[in-house]
């Protein structure tokens, strides 16, 4: 049997004739997105057809494994050009076209992942080729393709494969719609200035007005979090918290129900007891029982701390009600949590958040953050003036290795909210750093997308300290994308085990709790003066404030996720309410449906939200074992970190990387101490 004729043209050249370095482009119209989506599918399918049509005796590394790896590189870049605009484009038509492109391409991804003809030739190659003839990463790639083939059911009967394929296609569409609904939500609540009592003037002045002069408060983060923390009018907080947790309630509730059911069906067809067990097979945790034990033990250890913190909050609430002449009901409501947790910081630790943010103007934080990352990781960043992007607010930086001067990547910063934009903070890998078809290395390119408070004509963007922490976290993901030197796109950047992926960026959050880094990224926005030492010392001491309640809430979210993916016929809203009461000791607001707003459930974290806590075990161990001992800003430790943790991407197991960096197997001690818990034989970490 002859292979089909060679595919016409090269995907990169025909779909996106850009520079030889940055293949990304952001000037496509909705019509072009639609046309190029069809073209990309046709050209990529041609490669799969050629691989799948080979006679078995013709199967080789070059014709099979390398062909699949090469097309993955070009396909990934072109796909991102077409489907990333749905998250960031200011043009609604382009967002819609990009969303449709994502749906088509997701369906195509399913089709290609279910190619039994290709799978059979990959299996044949593994049996035919001596394992030691492949480089370690190529051998890992071969093993991973076979593992993924089995996880797609390609070893099962044809009718079962068809069922799995149809379920996968439907799941892709549902996930896209779930998050699109949240991104496109434009709900706002109108309030008078009196109803927004307690909020600072700069916040109030930044709000748009309704026709009758009321102030518009949206459900986006830069409005939601400040109001929940600072507004002293309980009814205003209640209305906003209720609206926030009712976003897309009806449509996403229906989507979530179908998602959970289809995931369970697919996992059962593949021989797994639950969807969680199917997902976790590829993670460090391996089984749902391991995750359940981890969460239960942590909840048990944190419970006394949570009880103490709730008692403090009730005291504060009683005093507040007496002061403002409000009735005290003796209970903590969901809309009370952030307000009184903020009061704990301000009264018990004397941290004035409004004063603090005056020392964190965006420009100063960005300058300090970039300087710290450059020094720590041995890099040089250069702003590319006038670079093309998807919006005028976006900035593009070039990244070079400081020692060699070699360019290793670029990153975009898109930091302010816009209508229709992705509503959280995230890092998007756009161009994987890996080897291209000719053996040259492709530049890694990533985008950090966030929603920090916009500047006004009078006041620059001022960041809350937790926003500075978010900035450091997400930029940590950017560095993971750019410093990775994997050979295969499949292992580039953050393509590591999902319950390890947060560890590298979580570790870098520690810098916003250390005095020297804080001094370097703070300066008063009016006077230019340094942040007072006592203000920073109070902030650093407040790190463990509310640690019990904050982490118990993380456990609630992780358990909701696990329950939905280990049990059938569970009502998500009821389950969330039960766990809030049982673990957090604070009831969910009646009538709300938080899981319908929980983007992680449809954003690749299904059965894996526990990973935020799980990976913190490793992030805290890395920080306290190396950086805290040898120097928080030590370039030597930073380079060890870049080499051992960031450089491999997913080309090695996380456990191997950790052992190399730590010099031993990981331990939980630093993690537990960071939560304010006692560990036998260990001193608490110095603040």
From Swiss-Prot:
Modified residues (Phosphotyrosine): 278
Modified residues (Phosphoserine): 16, 172
GO biological process entries: intracellular signal transduction; peptide catabolic process; peptide metabolic process; proteolysis
Tissues expressing this chain: Expressed abundantly in the testis. It is also found in the liver, lung and kidney.
Cofactor binding, per record: Binds 1 zinc ion per subunit.
Its EC number(s): 3.4.24.15
Keywords recorded for this protein, A-Z: Acetylation, Cytoplasm, Hydrolase, Metal-binding, Metalloprotease, Phosphoprotein, Protease, Zinc
Single GO molecular function: peptide binding
Broad class of where this protein is predominantly found: cytoplasm
UniProt catalytic activity: Preferential cleavage of bonds with hydrophobic residues at P1, P2 and P3' and a small residue at P1' in substrates of 5 to 15 residues
Active site per database record: 474
Names of required cofactors: Zn(2+)
UniProt-listed Pfam families: Peptidase_M3
Entry binding sites for Zn(2+): 473, 477, 480
Annotated positions of the N6-acetyllysine modification: 257, 538
Keyword Lipid metabolism: no
InterPro entries xref list: MetalloPept_cat_dom_sf, Neurolysin/TOP_dom2, Neurolysin/TOP_N, Pept_M3A_M3B, Pept_M3A_M3B_dom
Domain of life of the organism encoding this protein: Eukaryota
GO cellular component terms listed in the entry, alphabetical order: mitochondrial intermembrane space
Subcellular compartments: Cytoplasm
Assembly behavior: Monomer.
Role played: Involved in the metabolism of neuropeptides under 20 amino acid residues long. Involved in cytoplasmic peptide degradation. Able to degrade the amyloid-beta precursor protein and generate amyloidogenic fragments. Also acts as a regulator of cannabinoid signaling pathway by mediating degradation of hemopressin, an antagonist peptide of the cannabinoid receptor CNR1.
Similarity comment text for this entry: Belongs to the peptidase M3 family.
Protein name (record): Thimet oligopeptidase
Organism from which the protein derives: Rattus norvegicus
Lineage: Eukaryota, Metazoa, Chordata, Craniata, Vertebrata
């Amino acid at each position: 049997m002859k292979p089909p004729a060679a595919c016409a043209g090269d995907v990169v050249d025909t779909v996106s004739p850009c520079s030889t370095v940055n293949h990304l482009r952001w000037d496509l119209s909705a019509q072009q997105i639609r046309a190029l989506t069809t073209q990309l599918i046709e050209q990529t399918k041609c490669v799969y057809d050629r691989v799948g049509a080979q006679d078995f005796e013709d199967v080789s590394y070059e014709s099979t494994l390398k062909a699949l790896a090469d097309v993955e590189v070009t396909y990934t870049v072109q796909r991102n050009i077409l489907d990333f605009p749905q998250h960031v484009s200011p043009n609604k038509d382009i967002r819609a076209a990009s969303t449709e492109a994502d749906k088509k391409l997701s369906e195509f991804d399913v089709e290609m992942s279910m190619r039994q003809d290709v799978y059979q030739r990959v299996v044949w190659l593994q049996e035919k080729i001596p394992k030691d003839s492949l480089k370690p990463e190529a051998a890992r790639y071969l093993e991973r393709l076979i593992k993924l083939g089995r996880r797609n059911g390609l070893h099962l009967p044809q009718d079962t494969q068809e069922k799995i394929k149809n379920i996968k296609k439907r799941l892709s569409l549902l996930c896209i719609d779930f998050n699109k609904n949240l991104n496109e939500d434009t709900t706002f609540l109108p309030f008078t200035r009196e109803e927004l009592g307690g909020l600072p003037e700069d916040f109030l002045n930044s709000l748009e007005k309704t026709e009758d002069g009321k102030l518009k408060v949206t459900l986006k983060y830069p409005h939601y979090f400040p109001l929940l923390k600072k507004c002293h009018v309980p009814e205003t907080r209640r209305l906003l918290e209720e609206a926030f947790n009712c976003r897309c309630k009806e449509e996403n509730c229906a989507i979530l129900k179908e998602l959970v059911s289809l995931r369970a069906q697919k996992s059962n067809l593949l021989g797994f007891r639950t969807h969680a067990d199917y997902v976790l097979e590829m993670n460090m945790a391996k089984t749902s029982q391991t995750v359940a034990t981890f969460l239960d033990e942590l909840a048990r250890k944190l419970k006394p701390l949570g009880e103490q913190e709730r008692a403090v909050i009730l005291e504060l609430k009683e005093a507040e009600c007496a002061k403002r002449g409000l009735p005290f009901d003796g209970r903590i409501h969901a809309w009370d949590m952030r307000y009184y947790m903020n009061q704990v910081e301000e009264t018990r630790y004397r941290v004035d958040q409004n004063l603090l943010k005056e020392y964190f103007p965006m420009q100063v934080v960005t300058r300090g953050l970039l300087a710290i990352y450059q020094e720590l990781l041995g890099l040089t960043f250069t702003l590319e003036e006038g670079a093309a992007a998807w919006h005028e607010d976006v900035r593009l930086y070039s990244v070079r290795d400081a020692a060699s001067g070699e360019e290793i990547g670029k990153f975009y910063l898109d930091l302010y909210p816009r209508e229709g934009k992705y509503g959280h903070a995230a890092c998007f890998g756009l161009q994987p750093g890996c080897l291209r078809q000719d053996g040259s290395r492709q530049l890694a390119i990533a985008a950090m997308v966030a929603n920090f408070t916009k500047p006004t004509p009078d006041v620059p963007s001022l960041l809350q300290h937790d926003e500075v922490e978010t900035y450091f976290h997400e930029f940590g993901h950017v560095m993971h994308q750019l410093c990775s030197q994997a050979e295969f796109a499949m292992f580039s950047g953050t393509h590591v085990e999902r319950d390890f992926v947060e560890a590298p960026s979580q570790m870098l959050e520690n810098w916003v709790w250390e005095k020297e880094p804080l001094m370097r990224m703070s300066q008063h926005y009016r006077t230019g003066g340094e942040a007072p030492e006592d203000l920073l010392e109070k902030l650093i001491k407040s790190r463990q404030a509310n640690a019990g309640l904050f982490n118990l809430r993380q456990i609630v979210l992780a358990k909701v996720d696990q329950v939905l993916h280990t049990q059938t016929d569970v009502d998500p809203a009821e389950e969330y309410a039960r766990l809030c009461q049982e673990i957090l000791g604070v009831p969910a607001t009646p009538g709300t449906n938080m899981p319908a707003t929980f983007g992680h459930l449809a954003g690749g974290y299904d059965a894996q939200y526990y990973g935020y806590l799980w990976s913190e075990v490793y992030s805290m161990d890395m920080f306290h074992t190396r950086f805290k001992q040898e120097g928080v800003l030590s370039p030597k430790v930073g380079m060890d970190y870049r080499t051992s943790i960031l450089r491999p991407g997913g080309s090695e197991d996380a456990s191997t990387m950790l052992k190399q960096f730590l010099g031993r197997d990981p331990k939980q001690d630093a993690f537990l101490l960071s939560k304010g818990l006692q560990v036998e034989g260990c001193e608490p970490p110095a603040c």
